[in-house]
A protein has these predicted regions:
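Short alpha-helical segments enriched in small residues
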Residues: 4-165
Length: 165
């Protein structure tokens, strides 16, 4: 299973880098539940310096508030794993990066920490590109923590590829 994910990462991330180079676009990430894996996958490819601008791991609520200026009231009312928080993360990332494409990721990797309303495997992926901004919600069930992170990273890559093409 690890080899399959590795192959997917390398193939899809290389496709993404080539597409971004071709279109002369830069990308930045604000990660929470993926813990820097997204940025790591991109920068493990040769040529990534031409397209990768910024990678932030804002794992704690405090980091989200301090670095990405996510309002305390958003986290208190909706939680760090919410559409509202993800939207705030991607919007504010776009203000501090030098990128055309900005992506935010927040979720519950597990194996603990989930609730009935927000189960383990829940993830929100925010994307801002040109005038478009959206947040997608996914639920990846019955996955280990690392597999959840890998599936999330692959979903981000596929999402960016589909939006930029």
């Amino acid at each position: 299973l690890y080899c399959i994910y590795l192959l997917l990462f390398m193939t899809n991330s290389k496709k993404l880098i080539n597409l971004l180079k071709k279109k002369k676009l830069k990308i930045s990430f604000a990660e929470s539940c993926t813990g820097g894996l997204m940025s790591s996958v991109i920068t493990s490819n040769s040529g990534s310096s031409k397209v990768f601008d910024l990678g932030l791991v804002t794992y704690s609520n405090q980091a989200k508030q301090k670095i990405l200026r996510v309002p305390n009231k958003v986290i208190k009312k909706y939680g760090a794993v919410s559409v509202q928080c993800c939207l705030s993360m991607v919007n504010n990332l776009s203000k501090i990066s030098n990128s055309h494409i900005n992506v935010s990721i927040t979720g519950i990797a597990g194996p603990k920490g989930g609730t009935r309303k927000k189960p383990v495997g829940l993830v929100f992926i925010g994307l801002k590109f040109k005038k478009k901004i959206f947040v997608n919600k996914y639920l990846f069930k019955n996955k280990s923590r690392i597999n959840f992170q890998k599936i999330t990273v692959n979903k981000v890559i596929k999402t960016v590829l589909s939006v930029v093409k």
